[in-house]
Amino acid sequence: MQDFAKKKINIKSPAKINLHLEVIGKREDGFHELAMIMQNIDLADYLEFEINNEGLIKLESDCNDLSLSDDNLIVKSANLLRKKSNIDYGANIFLRKNIPIGAGLAGGSSNAAATLIGLNNLWDLKLDQETLCSLASTLGSDIPFFINGGIQLCFGRGEILEKLDSTLEYGAILLKNPNVSVSTAETYKKYSNRFCDQYLTDREMIENIRKNLRDNGLNNLNFDNQHLSIKNDLQLVVENENDSVKQALYLLSKLENCLTFSMSGSGPTCFALFKDKETAKKELTANSKLFKDKGYDSWVCTFLEKGITFI
């Protein structure tokens, strides 16, 4: 067995926000048919990978609230890659956690993708991006997005990706109550109970929605056109049932230089966009005490052109 014991890799694993989330219908496999725009932001976790020759995946973290066992997506990703590649050695992995858990920012999915990318390099497997995306899709619907990163159209259950040729430079303020989490599965179930009569099954109609997002999605996010809007269908469910989300959206809507605001994913994190990161920083400085007094953690972020990166 080749001795790679001293080889280490460090990776930045960024969060995402949804700039568009449209629930179109229900697929035969039980997943929902979606049309989304996802964007990486610079709120990120950091992972360190080191080869071990014991054939074991050992995960440690500075986050006490995180399971480090086989149900963790990092461990699942590593074991899947080992099985796929039929290798004998393992890895020691350390996760420095900054992205809040259960927040609608897909920190776990980002970590899973970072693990596939990192171990592909560490173990010198030379798997191409298409293969990594295929593996990622078996682990979770939005993990393939993180293999590619940046800003992307995401269709199907989230695994069908189309790169958007654009660089958005907005700043963002994120708010999340640290004591509140939202179950993604429960949110989709509640949405389906309320709106299943509006679901589409006709493939041509579904493709028309995809085409409309391709043609107009960026225009809706272009401040120069003074037409900045964000759609999140799941917000219709979560906002009505979660006072923390409702209050966060209200607080963000009242910020002086806010361009638009929304919930990310299935929540409960909410965000407001500003013309640049500096403007967002000033707004957070002016309102940080208010946010804290209302029970929210807050972050200032900007958009990333790329997703997971080696550091």
From Swiss-Prot:
It is an enzyme of class 2 (transferase). It comes from the Bacteria. One of its GO terms (biological process) is isopentenyl diphosphate biosynthetic process, methylerythritol 4-phosphate pathway. ATP binds at residues 100-110. Its EC number is 2.7.1.148. Catalyzes the phosphorylation of the position 2 hydroxy group of 4-diphosphocytidyl-2C-methyl-D-erythritol. Belongs to the GHMP kinase family. IspE subfamily. This is 4-diphosphocytidyl-2-C-methyl-D-erythritol kinase.
